[in-house]
Each structure stands twice: as structure tokens, then as C-alpha cells.
Design a protein with these regions (language model features):
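Residue-level marker of motif borders
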Residues: 1-3, 22, 88
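Alpha-helix initiation/capping motif
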Residues: 46, 64-71, 103, 155, ...
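A generic structural signal for alpha->beta connector loops
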Residues: 1, 36-38, 59, 85, ...
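N-terminal signal-anchor transmembrane helix
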Residues: 1-13
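Catalytic core of membrane glycerolipid acyltransferases/transacylases, capturing the structured
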Residues: 10-69, 77
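Short, flexible active-site-adjacent loop segments at beta-strand->alpha-helix junctions, enriched
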Residues: 8, 22-23, 35, 45, ...
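Non-catalytic C-terminal accessory region of glycerolipid acyltransferases
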Residues: 75-184
Length: 184
């Protein structure tokens, strides 16, 4: 279990989308280990290649997503999860980051889903790649929402704004976790 900082930033009520940087295959397990209630996770469709894997990952709340093209079925499932009051974990970089510093390009799905479901986004940051029996840290950043944008029609310009807010807030949370800046 990692050392968790910023627990006070977790919303006490309601559901939300968690966005987190992504270093390794164990990242979802690390985050799942700290949760008491059901947490759904977007996971690459390749994890669902056999009936056994599909059953296993589905039991843990994984929702398969095709990272190569828009996957409307996955988005619909995620929106249903949010509408039903559960939380959703998304790794918006779309793949593992092998560099351990700045974020890779952020994909647009997490912002769009939070905006559509009208739920806040909570940025999580792993300080570095998780290693068993080592000092591992997870920092929970301040939640943000898109309430100032509600009522706007979906457009590519709006999607860019949603994605940029994810990138800015997640990068700030990563920088705090890695000691580059101080938490406010």
C-alpha cells in the first residue's frame, strides 16, 4: 500500500472521475487497494483477450476500451457507471509513461465524460513507478469541475478546453507528488 498524501482533497460526497499518471501495470491495483467502494477503470481492450481474462478484469470493474479509434460503447458504459453514482478511474495518457516526469499527450475522453456526467475530476499522481517493498507515494490533488462550461454545446474547441484542464491539473498534481512545487 502506498503512502497517500492529500486525502483531504477527496470529495466526501458524490461521485467523480479520477485521472492519474500511468507508470506501470500495477497502477490500477495500487489505486484499487485504497478504495472501499466500487471503482471502475478504463482498461485497454487487449487485457480482455480470453474468456478468463474478460471475467477476471470485469470482476474488478475494468471497462475495455479500444485506444486506436473512438470507442462509443466504452464511453457509453463509463457514462452509465457515473450516472449510477460510481467513480471512474482513467489514465488519460492512454498508455504507460516510461519517462517518469512530464505527462505524455493527454487523450480527451476523461474530460468529455466528466463534463457530460457533470461530475468533478480528481487528479491522482504516483510519485514514481510502483515497486513492491519500496517507499511508494500517491498524491491526491484538488478536485475541479467544468461547471463554468455547462450549457455550452460540445465542439472540438470545447473538447480541447476540457482536455487542457485535465493536463494542467494533472501535471500540477504530478509536480507536487514529485516535490517540484509545494501544495497550496
Amino acid at each position: 500500500m502506498p503512502k497517500i498524501k492529500g486525502k483531504e482533497n477527496l470529495p466526501k460526497e458524490g461521485n467523480y472521475v479520477i485521472v492519474c499518471n500511468h507508470f506501470g501495470k500495477s497502477d490500477p491495483i495500487v489505486i484499487l487497494s485504497m478504495y472501499k467502494k466500487k471503482l471502475y477503470i478504463m482498461a485497454k481492450k487487449e487485457w480482455f483477450s480470453t474468456k478468463f481474462k474478460t471475467a477476471f478484469f470485469t470482476e474488478f470493474g475494468a471497462i475495455p476500451v479500444d485506444r486506436e479509434k473512438p470507442d462509443f460503447a466504452s464511453i457509453k458504459k463509463c457514462l452509465t457507471v457515473l450516472k449510477d453514482g460510481s467513480n471512474l478511474l482513467v489514465f488519460p495518457e492512454g498508455t504507460r509513461n516510461k519517462v517518469n516526469s512530464d505527462l505524455q499527450e493527454i487523450k480527451g475522453g476523461a474530460g468529455m465524460m466528466a463534463f457530460t456526467a457533470k461530475v468533478p475530476v480528481v487528479p491522482f499522481a504516483l510519485k514514481k513507478k510502483f515497486k513492491p517493498f519500496h517507499k511508494n507515494e500517491l498524491y491526491i490533488g484538488k478536485p475541479f469541475d467544468y461547471s463554468d462550461l455547462y450549457g455550452q454545446k460540445r465542439s472540438s474547441a470545447l473538447d480541447d478546453i476540457l482536455t487542457e484542464r485535465i493536463r494542467e491539473n494533472l501535471q500540477k498534481t504530478v509536480d507536487i507528488a514529485q516535490g517540484k512545487i509545494k501544495a497550496e
